[in-house]
Each structure stands twice: as structure tokens, then as C-alpha cells.
Amino acid sequence: MNSSGFMFNIDNGYLEGLCRGFKCGILKQADYLNLVQCETLEDLKLHLQGTDYGSFLANEPSPLSVSVIDDKLREKLVIEFQHMRNHAVEPLSNFLDFITYGYMIDNIILLITGTLHQRPISELIPKCHPLGSFEQMEAIHVASTPAELYNAVLVDTPLAPFFVDCISEQDLDEMNIEIIRNTLYKAYLEAFYNFCKNMGGATADVMCEILAFEADRRAIIITINSFGTELSKDDRAKLYPNCGKMYPDGLAALARADDYEQVKTVAEYYAEYAALFDGSGNNPGDKTLEDKFFEHEVKLDVYAFLQQFHFGVFYAYLKLKEQECRNIVWIAECVAQKHRAKIDNYIPIF
């Protein structure tokens, strides 16, 4: 072990070992082959008991529902993540906090949307992601105007730097809520990328690769989703995160694109993205571009575990488990609806 590894282990060795232990419990292909053969959700529960999920559904009464399975999967993952966060010291604690900011943005957008539509806060809070919860989250419901809402977000959340630089009070009233979400996410991704880059070493190597892909994926999806809408090319370009492999030339080309084929042409200049477009389609049996993006993300997250003494494993583990949760919920939906034709359309991890 080199000296940097020794120093890393003093503060972070236990948690990295714990995270790698959690990773060993991720479902293998053999587990999925068992799950897709289930006839009922009770069968599914039985098969999951034989994995690291154990008796996480033991206290749930029959008949089981997919939404209960979804909630319990998320609950288990949140407990694992929060356990690691509670035992972390700086700078790992800062890194883990950064991960939660993405969920916080989604929660803030949910609360802003609900507040502007006069929805009761008691109805909105349960829909928020627990990893993105923050102190005084319920205080936001006191805000009755966009200005009060804006100030509540600035005072009560760590997202203030992302808001101050790119969103004004007027924007909450006038700007499309999805534009606000993407503007915040651009600022967040760029800040997270710079944080990881400044850490240097294996953390920078692993995380900058993962976050660069996330930035490019968002730019591509924003472009495709903008076709046929009122969003101008200039406004669209302002939403692109500037920390991916497509920055700056690829993003400039994306900003000029008028249709899906032109986006595909831009992607062809980047080998890994060209492969994702080539392998996707909208015909029966084809994988969607979104599925191909998820597959590539899984590959990057699995690669993160090939190096030691870095923080990327914590991010990668969370993302792999989220994909696993989506897989289980997909299979559960197919079983519950007796719609087996597409039951194999999950994203394998190992």
C-alpha cells in the first residue's frame, strides 16, 4: 500500500470497505433469472428474501403492491447511504453531501410547483426523496409568493449558491419550471465536477469521467426534448452543463441542431456516444436511447470499483443500487400486470 492509500484509510478505509461490502450484495444475473420467472408479487418477495434484501418486506401485509416494494427498496438504500454519511468526516462528508444536492433540487422543484399551484405541503412532503430532505423543509409552505419562496430556499437549503448565480425571484413566477430545474442542475453538476477535480487523484479520475458523461447526457436529452417546443436555440444552449466531453465544440453543434438526426450526427464525433445512438431505436424490440444511456452509466459505475482509495465508489454504489431498484420495480410491474412480453427489459449490472 502506498502512503496516499495509507492516509486515505485512516479516515475513510472503514467506510470504503463497508461500501464495497454493500456492492457485493447487488443482484447478479442469476437472481434476475429467478425474479423474471415469478408468477406473483409474493413469489418475488420470496426470491428477494434469499438475497441481501433479506426480510425487508416481512412486515408488509398481503396483497403486496408495486408501490410498497418501491418504497421499501428506496428506504433500505437511504438507510445504507445515511449510515455511511453519519460516519464520514471531511472531505468525504462534503462529497456525500454533494451527492444529496441533486435530490434536493428535485425536491425543491416539487415544492415550488406545488406551492405555486396551492397544493398542501402535507401532500407534497411524502413525495419528496428522503436523500434530498433538509432542515425546515416544511417551512417552505409558509411562503405564499414567489419572492417568499425564493428567500425560503436561500435561507433553508445548501442550494443557495446555485440559486443566487442563475435564478432570480422573478424567474420563479415567469420561467418554465423545467428550465429552472435544468438551470439549477447545470450549476450543480459544474460545481460537483470542480469539487472532484480539485480533490485530485483517483477520485478526480473516476468522478470526472462519470460526471462528464452525466453532463453530456443531459445536454443531449435537453436538445431532443426541446424540438417542437417554444424553447429557443439560445435559451437551450444556456442549459447545457459545461463540464462534459462535448464541451465546447460538441455543445455548440448541439445548440444548432434542428432534429434528432442532427443530434445523432453530433454524437458520432464521440466514439462512446456514437455507439449508444447506433444501438438504439423506436421499433419493437429496440432499446431506447434512455436505456442505452443507463447501460453506459452502469458500465462507468462498475469501473469505479476497479480502483481503490477514492470517493467514487460511494457515488457509483448509490447509482448502481438505484438502477437495481428500477429493475426490480420494472419486473414487479410486469408480474403484477401479467404483462410478461417486456419483463426482460431491465438493465443488467453484473
Swiss-Prot record:
Assembly and partners? Answer: V-ATPase is a heteromultimeric enzyme made up of two complexes: the ATP-hydrolytic V1 complex and the proton translocation V0 complex. The V1 complex consists of three catalytic AB heterodimers that form a heterohexamer, three peripheral stalks each consisting of EG heterodimers, one central rotor including subunits D and F, and the regulatory subunits C and H. The proton translocation complex V0 consists of the proton transport subunit a, a ring of proteolipid subunits c9c'', rotary subunit d, subunits e and f, and the accessory subunits VhaAC45 and ATP6AP2.
Give the residues annotated as coiled coil: none
Q: Which GO terms describe its biological process?
A: cellular response to increased oxygen levels; intracellular iron ion homeostasis; proton transmembrane transport; terminal branching, open tracheal system; vacuolar acidification; vacuolar transport
The function of this protein is: Subunit of the V0 complex of vacuolar(H+)-ATPase (V-ATPase), a multisubunit enzyme composed of a peripheral complex (V1) that hydrolyzes ATP and a membrane integral complex (V0) that translocates protons. V-ATPase is responsible for acidifying a variety of intracellular compartments in eukaryotic cells, thus providing most of the energy required for transport processes in the vacuolar system. May play a role in coupling of proton transport and ATP hydrolysis.
The family database entries (InterPro entries) matched by this protein are listed as: ATPase_csu/dsu_sf, ATPase_V0-cplx_csu/dsu, ATPase_V0-cplx_dsu, V-type_ATPase_csu/dsu, V-type_ATPase_csu/dsu_dom_3
Q: Print the keywords alphabetically.
A: Hydrogen ion transport, Ion transport, Transport
Q: Name one GO cellular component term.
A: plasma membrane
Gene Ontology MF terms: proton-transporting ATPase activity, rotational mechanism
**A Pfam family hit:** vATP-synt_AC39
Describe the family membership recorded for this protein in Swiss-Prot or TrEMBL.
Belongs to the V-ATPase V0D/AC39 subunit family.
Q: Which organism is it from?
A: Drosophila melanogaster
For this entry, the protein name equals V-type proton ATPase subunit d 1
